[in-house]
C-alpha cells in the first residue's frame, strides 16, 4: 500500500466522526491516533522483553529507564501490559484502559500526546460513544516498520496534515514542502562536502528552525545514509505548531534520534537551541502565514 492509499484509509476514520465533530477538528483525533498506532507497532516485537525487564528492575529497586530503552531498541518504551489490540477486549473500559496505556509510555512520548491535547479528545470520543469504534479502526491499520518505512510514514503524516489544512482553509505552504524540492535543497547543501561526508564514522549535525513534521530533516538523513551508511547525522529542530511538533518528535524518536533535540516554540522569539551550533541548516519558513515576531 503506497502512502496515498494508506493516508486515504486512515482518513476514512472521518466517516465515523462526521456529525459529532466539525471537519476542522478531524485532525485532533486522526493525527494522535496515527502516531499512537505507529508507536504501538514499532514496540510490538520487544514488548514482552520490556515488561519482563521492568518487573525485574522494579524488584531490585533500580532505575529501569536505561535498561528498558536497551530492551526496546528504541529511544522510547511502554511498560503497560496493554497494547492497542488488547484494548479491543474490554469495550466497557476502553477509555480508562487507553489512558492507562498512554501513561505507560516513557516521558518523551507522554509529552507528545499532551501537546496533541489527546486526553481531552479521548474523553470527548468516549462521551460521543465513538471511542471504541475509532480505536478499532486504527487497530486494523498495520503501521509496523516492516510494512511502512519511516520515509513512507513521514509522507503519510504530511498528506494527512495537507488534507486537514485544506478543510480548515489554512495555507498548505505552512505545513508541506514537496519532497522533490527538499531533495534538491539537500543535494545543494551537501554537495560541497561530498568527500568529507564519505569518510567512515563521520558525524555531523543539522538544524531546521521551522521543522514542521520533520520532512527536511528526514530527507537529509536519508541522503546521507544512502551515500554513506557509516555516517551519522544528528538532527535538531524547532516547531511552532504543537501538532506538527508532536509528529516531528515522534518521527525523530522512531528514527533513533534524541527527542530532546526537537523544541516547541517560535524559533525567532523563543530560540530553544540558542547556545547550540550546527554543521548544516535548512528551512522552509511558513511564507504563507503572517509573521509572528
Locate the predicted segments by residue.
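Conserved S-adenosyl-L-methionine
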Residues: 172-283, 288-290
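Non-catalytic, mostly N-terminal accessory regions of nucleic-acid modification and defense proteins
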Residues: 1-194, 261-272
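A mobile, often basic/glycine-rich helix-loop segment
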Residues: 293
Amino acid at each position: 500500500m503506497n502512502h496515498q492509499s494508506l493516508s486515504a484509509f486512515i482518513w476514512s476514520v472521518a466517516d465515523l466522526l462526521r456529525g459529532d465533530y466539525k471537519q476542522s477538528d478531524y485532525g485532533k483525533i486522526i493525527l494522535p491516533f496515527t502516531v499512537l498506532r505507529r508507536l504501538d507497532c514499532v514496540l510490538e516485537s520487544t514488548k514482552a522483553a520490556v515488561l519482563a525487564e521492568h518487573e525485574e528492575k522494579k524488584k531490585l529497586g533500580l532505575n529501569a529507564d536505561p535498561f528498558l530503552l536497551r530492551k526496546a531498541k528504541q529511544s522510547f518504551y511502554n511498560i503497560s501490559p496493554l497494547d492497542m489490540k488488547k484494548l479491543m477486549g474490554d469495550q466497557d473500559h476502553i477509555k480508562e484502559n487507553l489512558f492507562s496505556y498512554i501513561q505507560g509510555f516513557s516521558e518523551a512520548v507522554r509529552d507528545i500526546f499532551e501537546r496533541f491535547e489527546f486526553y481531552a479528545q479521548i474523553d470527548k470520543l468516549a462521551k460521543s460513544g465513538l471511542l471504541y469504534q475509532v480505536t478499532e479502526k486504527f487497530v486494523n491499520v498495520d503501521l509496523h516498520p516492516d510494512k511502512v518505512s519511516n520515509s513512507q510514514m513521514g509522507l503519510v503524516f504530511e498528506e494527512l496534515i495537507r488534507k486537514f489544512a485544506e478543510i480548515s482553509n489554512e495555507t498548505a505552504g505552512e505545513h508541506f514542502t514537496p519532497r522533490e524540492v527538499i531533495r534538491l535543497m539537500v543535494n545543494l547543501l551537501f554537495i560541497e562536502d561530498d568527500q568529507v561526508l564519505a569518510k567512515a564514522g563521520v558525524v555531523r549535525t543539522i538544524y531546521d528552525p521551522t521543522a514542521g513534521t520533520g520532512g527536511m530533516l528526514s530527507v537529509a538523513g536519508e541522503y546521507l545514509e544512502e551515500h554513506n551508511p557509516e555516517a551519522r547525522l544528528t538532527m535538531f529542530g524547532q516547531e511552532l505548531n504543537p501538532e506538527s511538533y508532536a509528529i516531528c518528535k515522534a518521527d525523530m524518536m522512531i528514527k533513533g534520534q534524541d527527542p530532546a533535540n526537537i523544541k516547541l516554540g517560535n524559533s525567532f522569539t523563543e530560540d530553544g537551541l540558542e547556545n547550540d551550533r550546527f554543521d548544516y541548516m535548512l528551512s522552509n519558513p511558513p511564507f504563507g502565514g503572517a509573521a509572528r515576531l
